[in-house]
From Swiss-Prot:
It comes from Caenorhabditis elegans. Gene3D superfamilies: Classic Zinc Finger (3.30.160.60). Probable transcriptional regulator, which participates in the transcriptional repression of the presenilin protein hop-1. Might play a role in the oxidative stress response. Disruption phenotype: RNAi-mediated knockdown results in reduced survival upon paraquat treatment to induce oxidative stress. Residues 552-561, 898-907 have a biased composition (Acidic residues). Residues 874-897, 908-920 have a biased composition (Basic and acidic residues). Residues 1-11, 956-979 have a biased composition (Polar residues). This is Suppressor of presenilin protein 4. It comes from the Eukaryota.
Length: 1311
């Protein structure tokens, strides 16, 4: 390869060492040591297959140099394989292929070429790594033909091989092997003999049908001779400039061959130009290292081939756009390429008003001046600014369409006339609009005020507003001023758009009835005297007080002086009349008065101080001059006026009322104020003077010799101001239960009951004071009126309802109907549909009623007939009704049997055998043999009665709705009236005389409720349209439907059958149970379901498609079974997630100091039971009045299970309104059950004292004659001996309490 022989020994040794290294590398490659090199390295070797090599090295033959034909044929074979597989094999990318290639062979094919050297790569990442070798600092091994440098000799050797095979410059495409011929073969052999090798890599394969155009280079023998004789020039890196790059022919981006399905296309000149490739010039490089470089041989210059530019679609589009014919406007120089733009532009030539183009031959107009400026650019001139705006009759328009001068003059005259007419109409409209219908000018003629028309110079005068409005409508045509409001009220001038609106206005404004005084009286009763007086006197006080009262800064600390000192502009008599507070304490040295002793003492001390400012009438002094001025106003007039006044209080009040009447009538005349409002104000002023405590929250009262407080709205009293303030808050807030006599509200019915009892004591004291019958509504008597003045009350004549307002009594009495509605009170005829009203009514019976039975609410049907419930089964009326009905049925049955069997009269007369009843087919109820009554003598004496336990006894252990037998193995007795009488021990009467067969039909709460719902028209349950969920309440169904919608972000747990989605897995499990009802899923079918893809659905047949997989079928049953498979999978996944969740910390309810009570809690009227659930509340109420085996000591609660009754006694009777006897009974019960331990100093037989009973049952002893209460019985005995010794049976009760015994028939209660 080199022209100069190497003479140095070092070069020979270096070549020998390189040969040894190549041999070692060759042996290592044969053993597969370099298989794990990175494929992304553009210079690295690919992985070699181990199967192509043998383990024995002796079989390897020395490498043989191949000819160009062999290499070219081998490369063409590789290319054919690439086109078929479209993926390069490891062998094609390896440097050593079958170990028959030359040591300088390198593959250099790919769509990505380097612009500084002939290297080509398959990927952009490989090219990027290669370009980094051309950039940056110079490394240890650098190339002399380009700026390539590497840190290893192997990379440089690989780069030099590329230069040697493909030349110095960057190749544009993969070179194509020329067609072999005889001349070429001799040429190749001669070239190889000289040491120059011309190797060409394979060309990319094109379509098989398309012809391949190859540009071959023909070399003559003369050129070869010259090529051999001339020595190659020495290439120096410093002298050579940058190589001239030949333009690369376009290569397809995907580097894929053409599709085989493409049809063969004819060869054209343009395609021939595209298919031709240019062979890049080749150079030569030394085969050794960079230190021993020899220049490449000189080659003859080859003519540069012609370069043809590829025409793409974009270039074709550009040329097409240029050659298109542009559309031109006939009126102006505007041109465009589309018809739509031309039509849009021509619309500007057709406008009738706007900014017109100043050009003579152009009539283009636009509505904005900015667009006209863009248009005028086409005329190539300066646009005069501002442009001219032309309307329909403008001169500019006429210039474009020339007409005669006469027509122009006519048009201008018409336009001017029209303008004048419009101006006149606008002026008249403005004048009429300014002069409103109700406005006028006051004119006084002979001391009579007239109303003059204010439109123009009209001289119309009238005294009424209606005549003025009619005048304006007829004379001045005021309707035209407001064409949208054509309808006009001639009375007040109101305008309306429609006749209906005018009609409603007249009905509302001009047909009002006369205000009656009794309506105001009812309003006063409803809102109360306090609010009524303040509301009606607020206007009068504003008129009297011209200037607001300023707060006086008293530095001396006299807080009471600001409230007592009058304003400077108010008359002293008016001030005395407006005063509302009674004065209790007076100063001895001046006329100052104070409501408290402390304020009066502070004022009195200032008489003996020497401050800066002193009073001129007394020795009182102060540090503020304003305070002294206000103090001096108390001296002159008030003292003199008090000396001449009469001692009678009545005359004083009447004098003040006269003064106030003058102040009411003194202000400016008010035409709209009626005499009724004046009379109401005078009445309110009298009430305010008679009852000055209306403005106070509470008043003082002596309680047990101690100063206390009493509420001004109700009889509540307290010794402490804090308790009174908390009580007053109950009058201001709105809560669940409300008092009927005041504004007291509470959430607890027990508190309302205690509050009503305080009213009952006051009502009893005024029961006999002027009681009169109240008659309203055509002679209907609704109640009684008792008391006088402020203490007047109205009482219902059918129940203990009491109110302060007559209207409230009238509304209450309407609920005492002849035919009840759904709910009715057990103690009176009060009925209502609302359950809340019934609860409040029962509290009235408990609080205001005297010696009444405990009320409860009954249910009635639509006709007013009572509906039987479990609480009514023990009543005598129910027993009588059942027994009479049973007798009638028995008589009818006997008569039917007598007609059928006249011969067997004896069997009919007996009536005890059950065989006769079983033979009757029309009798549908079940009959059973009568059980013999249990005899206590047979089984020995026992403390408890022996009888059958009902299903209630085992309701906590087993679901009693499924019970058919109780624990004893015998059938459960029915809850008919006959069996209840037997269980209660009632013998005799009509029921004992007639023998009755026992019925084994079970009756429980859920059966009774379902029967009542079916009988009395309860609403049917509503079904969800998306899933099987049902509910009878629409609100609940609406909440369920909310989880079928996904308005927000989707929830994590969704159903597989419908659109239901929720936040918790447990809620989804509950929902999936609805879909699983009635669907049987066999777990053994899982495998078949999993691999089943579905059935083929013929056209026109309804199909069912699964939304979770590709299953489809036309059979609905198969679809249900398939969806059950998905549902079961979802259930299994949810169960697994629930099991894998970490255990939650058990919730520990915080210990509360006070018992928490829900706002919607329901309270029992007979005990202290309360709950939120309606079903639990009904179940508890049913046990009250149920005559069962075990009974409560304090109420009528009973049950067949002893533990249930024990729990009731321990928790539902926390000493509320019980007698001392019931307290002792409950305490005894607690002692027996171990809740209360017996004291150590007592034996088991001795009973605890009442003090221990009361203290351990958490109760307070209350005196029966007053409000006193205590904890110990000895204190109560002492209290009764001091205050109530004269009461009947008081001595006997006191003696029992002193001895620590329970008094017989005690009336002592607990709080």
């Amino acid at each position: 390869m080199s022209s100069e022989p190497t003479s140095s020994i070092e070069s020979d040794n270096l070549r020998r060492s390189k040969r040894k290294k190549f041999k070692l590398d060759f042996v290592a490659a044969a053993h597969g040591n370099n298989q794990k090199k990175s494929r992304k390295d553009p210079h690295g070797q690919g992985d070699d297959d181990d199967d192509t090599f043998d383990d024995d090295l002796n079989h390897f033959e020395p490498l043989s140099v191949l000819t160009e034909q062999d290499v070219s044929m081998e490369m063409f074979e590789d290319d054919e394989e690439d086109t078929v597989s479209r993926r390069r094999t490891r062998r094609s990318t390896a440097h050593f292929q079958d170990y028959q290639e030359p040591d300088r062979w390198i593959e250099n094919s790919g769509p990505h070429a380097c612009h500084k050297c002939p290297s080509r790569y398959e990927s952009k990442s490989s090219l990027a790594n290669h370009t980094k070798m051309h950039l940056g600092e110079k490394r240890k091994f650098a190339c002399e033909l380009c700026d390539f440098s590497a840190s290893t000799l192997k990379s440089l050797t690989h780069h030099n091989n590329i230069h040697q095979n493909f030349g110095v410059l960057s190749q544009q495409t993969s070179p194509v092997i020329p067609v072999a011929s005889s001349a070429d073969s001799t040429l190749n052999s001669s070239i190889n003999s000289t040491g120059c090798q011309i190797n060409a890599p394979p060309a990319p394969k094109l379509d098989e049908e398309a012809p391949i155009a190859v540009e071959s280079v023909v070399v003559h023998h003369e050129d070869v001779a010259e090529f051999d004789t001339t020595p190659p020039p020495i290439l120096e890196r410093e002298d050579d400039g940058p190589p001239v790059l030949i333009r690369e022919a376009p290569v397809r981006k995907s580097n894929r061959p053409m599709k085989p399905t493409q049809k063969a296309q004819k060869m054209t000149k343009q395609r021939e130009r595209k298919s031709k490739t240019v062979e890049s010039p080749k150079g030569s490089l030394p085969s050794s290292s960079a230190s021993s470089v020899t220049p490449p041989p000189v080659r003859k210059d080859v003519e540069k081939p012609k370069i043809f530019v590829k025409t793409t679609k974009k270039n074709l589009k550009k040329t097409m756009k240029i050659t298109k014919v542009r559309q031109r406007c006939p009126h102006c120089p505007f041109t465009t390429s589309t018809v739509t733009r031309l039509n849009r532009h021509s619309g500007g030539h057709k406008l009738k008003e706007g900014y017109i183009c100043p050009s003579e031959n152009c009539n283009f107009m636009c509505r904005k001046a900015g667009f006209l400026q863009k248009h005028y650019i086409l005329h190539k001139g300066t646009l005069p600014w501002p442009p001219e705006y032309v309307k329909k009759g403008g001169a500019k328009m006429k210039r474009t369409f020339p007409e005669s001068e006469e027509k122009k003059i006519e048009v201008t005259e018409k336009v001017q006339k029209m303008k004048k007419m419009h101006k006149r109409r606008a002026n008249t409209v403005q004048v009429v609009a300014k002069a409103q219908l109700k406005s006028y000018i006051k004119v006084e003629v002979d001391d009579v005020i007239f109303k003059k028309c204010n439109i123009g110079e009209c001289e119309f005068l009238t005294q009424t507003l209606t005549q003025l409005i009619v005048h304006k409508v007829k004379t001045h045509d005021t309707k035209t001023a407001f064409p949208q409001h054509r309808f006009l009220c001639l009375t007040c001038g109101h305008r309306a758009k429609s006749y209906a609106a005018l009609r409603t206005h007249k009905l509302i404004e001009h047909t009002s009835t006369h205000k009656r005084f009794h309506r105001t009286y009812y309003l006063k009763e409803c809102v109360g005297d306090k609010f009524f007086v303040k509301y009606n006197l607020s206007k009068v006080q504003e008129e009297v007080k011209e200037e607001p009262k300023e707060a006086d800064g008293d530095e001396s600390g006299d807080e009471s002086f600001d409230s007592m000192c009058p304003a400077s502009d108010v008359h002293p008599e008016t001030l005395a009349a407006i005063e509302m507070k009674d004065v209790f304490f007076c100063c001895n040295m001046c006329p100052y008065k104070a409501p408290t002793m402390n304020r009066c003492q502070r004022h009195y001390d200032k008489h003996f101080k020497n401050d800066e400012f002193k009073c001129q009438y007394c020795s009182w002094s102060s540090r503020s001059k304003e305070v002294i001025v206000n103090h001096e106003k108390l001296h002159p007039t008030v003292v003199v006026a008090n000396t001449n006044e009469a001692p009678v209080v009545k005359n004083e009040i009447e004098a003040k009322v006269e003064v106030l009447s003058k102040t009411v009538s003194s202000p400016v005349e008010c035409t709209e104020e009626s005499s009724l409002s004046k009379s109401i104000q005078l009445w309110c002023q009298r009430e305010k003077l008679r009852h000055p405590e209306l403005d106070e929250q509470f008043t003082r009262k002596m309680i047990d010799g101690v100063k206390g407080f009493q509420c001004t709205d109700c009889p509540y009293t307290s010794k402490y101001r804090g308790d009174m303030r908390s009580h007053k808050k109950r009058h201001d807030i709105e809560q669940l239960y409300r008092c009927v006599q005041c504004t007291y509200t509470t959430n607890r019915p027990v508190s309302l009951k205690d509050h009503l009892k305080q009213h009952a004591i006051v009502n009893m004291s005024i029961a006999d004071i002027k009681s009169r019958r109240v008659v309203v509504n055509q002679g209907v008597k609704i109640g009684m009126r008792r008391g006088v003045g402020k203490d007047k009350i109205y009482c219902c004549d059918k129940c203990p309802y009491v109110t302060l307002a007559l209207g409230c009594l009238w509304r209450h009495h309407r609920n005492h109907r002849d035919t009840a509605k759904i709910n009715i009170c057990s103690n009176c005829s009060y009925s209502s549909i609302d359950q809340r009203k019934m609860e409040e009514h029962t509290i009235i019976h408990l609080g205001l009623g005297l010696n009444e039975a405990v009320p409860f609410v009954k249910r009635v049907d639509q006709k007013g007939r009572p509906v039987s419930s479990l609480t009514d089964l023990n009543s005598e009326k129910m027993n009588e009704r059942k027994s009479t009905k049973r007798k009638m049925l028995d008589k009818v049955e006997k008569m039917e049997v007598g007609e059928d069997e006249e011969d067997d009269e004896e069997s009919v007369d007996k009536g005890t055998d059950d065989g006769d009843y079983k033979q009757r087919p029309e009798k549908k109820r079940k009959q059973s043999s009568e059980e013999p009554a249990s005899d206590p003598e047979l089984f020995g004496s026992s403390s408890q009665p022996t009888r059958q336990l009902s299903e209630r006894a085992t309701r906590n252990r087993i679901n009693y709705s499924l019970l058919s037998k109780n624990g004893s193995g015998k059938p459960t007795p029915s809850t008919s009236s006959a069996n209840l009488e037997k269980l209660a021990g009632s013998s005799g009467g009509a029921s004992s005389e007639s023998p009755e067969p026992d019925e084994s039909v079970e009756v429980s709460h859920w059966k009774i409720r379902t029967f009542l719902r079916s009988e009395y028209g309860v609403k049917e349950s509503l079904k969800c349209p998306d899933c099987p969920y049902k509910s009878s309440e629409p609100d609940v169904l609406e909440k369920h439907r909310y989880y079928h919608m996904t308005k927000t972000t989707p929830r994590p747990y969704a159903c597989s059958d419908c659109t239901f989605n929720t936040y918790t897995p447990t809620a989804l499990l509950q929902h999936l149970k609805l879909h699983s009802e009635g669907v049987y899923f066999d777990p053994m079918v899982k495998k078949h379901m999993k691999h089943r893809k579905g059935d083929s659905i013929p056209p026109g047949v309804k199909g069912y498609y699964c939304k979770n997989c590709s299953f489809k079928t036309s059979i609905h049953r198969n679809f249900i079974e398939h969806s059950a498979y998905h549902r079961q999978q979802l259930i299994n996944r949810i169960n697994i997630t629930l099991k894998r969740q970490p255990p939650r910390i058990e919730y520990q309810r915080p210990k509360l100091k006070h018992q928490f009570v829900a706002k919607n809690a329901k309270y029992c009227k007979k005990c202290t039971f309360k709950c939120v659930s309606q079903s639990n509340f009904i179940e508890h109420l049913d046990r009250h009045g149920w005559n069962q085996l075990y009974k409560c000591y304090s109420c009528d609660y009973s049950d067949n299970t002893k533990s249930v009754v024990d729990f009731h006694q321990l928790n539902h009777h926390i000493v509320k309104d019980q007698t001392l006897h019931s307290i002792c009974q409950s305490a005894k019960f607690r002692l027996e059950n171990g809740v209360i331990q017996i004291p150590e100093f007592q034996t088991e037989k001795s009973k605890p004292t009442p003090d221990e009973f009361v203290s351990k049952t958490r109760g307070l002893l209350k005196c029966p004659s007053c409000e006193y209460f205590c904890h110990v019985s000895s204190e109560l005995a002492f209290h009764m001996s001091v205050h109530h010794l004269t009461e009947p049976n008081a001595r006997e009760t006191i003696s029992y309490l002193h001895m620590g015994l329970v008094p017989p028939k005690a009336t002592v209660t607990t709080v």
